[in-house]
């Protein structure tokens, strides 16, 4: 625990996780690490474990995430926290496993459009979760379909508190620009004159965007590069459903009240419980979600099986030699896993504040849905102590927050265990399996980056917005919106 500060050590169990858990299958992976389903060998309970590398002393966000999870264990609308362990410099956060995966998984793996009844049922439970969070002075700050997990019991649960905030008091407001670009509220990006920040109403805006995302399988403006989106959101009219007539007046009104550009005129989560659309969703919420999950699981299982077979076939062709995967002569930015050369203007990096490594999130002119937009952090405070970026730097950051990989996400459990589509690990211990998956992920990531660089054309398009980005930059050092005007 050498890299863990004293305050965080108190949160970590002294038990050996190798003796408690056995890895079953990978359900998510990214530059942050790996999320696996594991079985508790004591009580045979299946849990989800987030594996994170502990490097340096950047533990504040993890400490906050764990604190929030601990403080919300009694809420049925928030993913339950089971404990925290460290093994060989790897942090393991143990949480309940939701067998239906995320709402994003269901939409993408099953290629379905949710019905209005399903959307209402899900939104009701999300609102209940927000009521609990906001009453306890917690802002989620990253509400979206990818962060809502569901299970066969018909429960919808908020997850991923890596960028959440705990307010000091009821009147306290936040100033850090954080969240996923397409779901961010106008006041988070560009606080109105005279405003000292934003509060829980920012989550209500994200909820409205999530409602549209569930109805249309993508959030508004998803055709735009995320850099451009942060310039557009504060100055455009509030989004609506593309074809309002296809939906009920109650649903249209729900979106309208959530997406009021004046934050103080948006309803609170408590207010939304009395909205006709949410009251309609409450009536049959759990049966509706349960039926949806049961219907989708076979399709999702087949999707994952095929993906696992494809990956195994690719590995068989390439061989297991990983000696040269991180080689090459390109200069790397401090700790970066991507080259600073060859990236187009407008390229975004996601920065892992735990490992201080960067990977390409989305390049200019592309539309990559696999990362679901990423998570954006911009610190307006002058006392920023982050070691990965100086105050005033705009980055797309992991900060402990999971960016879902659509192709590798939440797998279902069959009676007696997992199906034959499970990922095959090298090594036998938890840590060895974690290291094995990191190698696989980094190998695929580097192959994708190499392919992207080969196909890259020297194009210059619309991302050079007012406010000015340095041509060829990969990390931007200006506020997303000029707030001094």
Curated annotation (Swiss-Prot):
GO cellular component: cytoplasm; nucleus
Active site, renumbered: 142
Biased composition (Acidic residues): 310-324, 406-417, 450-468
Entry binding sites for ATP: 27-35, 50
Bias (Polar residues): 474-485
PROSITE patterns (UniProt xref): PROTEIN_KINASE_ATP, PROTEIN_KINASE_DOM, PROTEIN_KINASE_ST
Enzyme class: transferase
Biased amino acid composition, Low complexity: 370-393
A GO MF label: protein serine kinase activity
Xref: CDD domains: STKc_MST1_2
Family assignment from sequence similarity: Belongs to the protein kinase superfamily. STE Ser/Thr protein kinase family. STE20 subfamily.
Name under which the protein is recorded: Serine/threonine-protein kinase dst4
Organism, as annotated: Dictyostelium discoideum (Social amoeba)
Gene: dst4
């Amino acid at each position: 625990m050498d890299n863990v500060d004293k305050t965080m050590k108190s949160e970590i169990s002294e038990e050996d996780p190798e003796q408690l858990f056995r890895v079953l299958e990978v359900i998510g992976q990214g530059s942050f690490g790996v999320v696996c389903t594991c079985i508790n060998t004591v009580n045979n309970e299946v849990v989800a474990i987030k594996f994170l590398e502990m490097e340096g002393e950047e533990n504040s966000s993890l400490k906050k995430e764990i604190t929030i999870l601990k403080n919300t264990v009694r809420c049925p609308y928030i993913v339950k926290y089971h404990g925290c362990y460290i093994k060989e410099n790897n942090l393991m956060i143990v949480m309940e496993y939701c067998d239906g995966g995320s709402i994003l998984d269901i939409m993408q793996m099953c290629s379905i459009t949710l019905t209005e009844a399903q959307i209402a049922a899900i939104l009701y439970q999300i609102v209940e979760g927000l009521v609990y969070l906001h009453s306890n002075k917690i802002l989620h700050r990253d509400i979206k379909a990818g962060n809502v997990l569901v299970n066969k019991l018909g429960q919808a649960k908020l997850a991923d508190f890596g960028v959440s905030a705990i307010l000091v008091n009821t009147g306290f407001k936040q100033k850090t620009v954080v969240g996923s670009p397409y779901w961010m509220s106008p006041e988070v990006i560009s606080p109105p004159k005279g405003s000292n920040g934003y509060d829980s109403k920012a989550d209500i805006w994200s909820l409205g965007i999530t409602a549209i995302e569930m109805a249309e399988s993508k959030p508004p403006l998803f055709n735009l590069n995320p850099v451009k989106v942060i310039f557009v959101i504060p100055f455009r009219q509030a989004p609506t459903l593309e074809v309002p007539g296809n939906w009920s007046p109650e649903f249209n009104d729900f979106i309208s009240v959530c997406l009021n550009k004046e934050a103080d005129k948006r309803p609170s989560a408590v207010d939304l419980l009395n909205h006709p659309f949410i009251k309609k969703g409450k009536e049959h919420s759990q049966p509706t979600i349960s039926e949806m999950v049961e219907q989708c699981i076979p399709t999702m299982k087949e999707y994952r099986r095929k993906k696992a077979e494809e990956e195994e076939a690719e590995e068989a062709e390439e061989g297991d030699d990983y000696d040269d995967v991180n080689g090459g002569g390109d200069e790397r930015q401090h700790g970066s896993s991507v080259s600073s050369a060859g990236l187009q203007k407008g390229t975004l990096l996601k920065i892992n504040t735990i490992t201080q490594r960067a990977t390409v999130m989305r390049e200019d002119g592309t539309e990559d849905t696999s990362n679901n937009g990423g998570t954006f952090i911009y610190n307006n405070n002058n006392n920023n102590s982050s070691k990965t970026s100086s105050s005033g730097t705009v980055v797309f950051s992991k900060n402990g927050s999971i960016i879902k990989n659509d192709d590798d996400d939440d797998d279902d459990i069959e009676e007696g265990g997992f199906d034959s589509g499970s990922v095959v690990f090298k090594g036998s211990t938890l840590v060895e399996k974690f290291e094995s998956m990191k190698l696989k992920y980094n190998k695929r990531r580097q192959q994708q980056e190499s392919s992207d660089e080969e196909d890259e054309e020297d194009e210059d398009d619309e991302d050079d917005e007012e406010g000015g980005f340095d041509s060829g930059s990969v990390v931007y050092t200006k506020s997303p919106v000029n707030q001094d005007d």
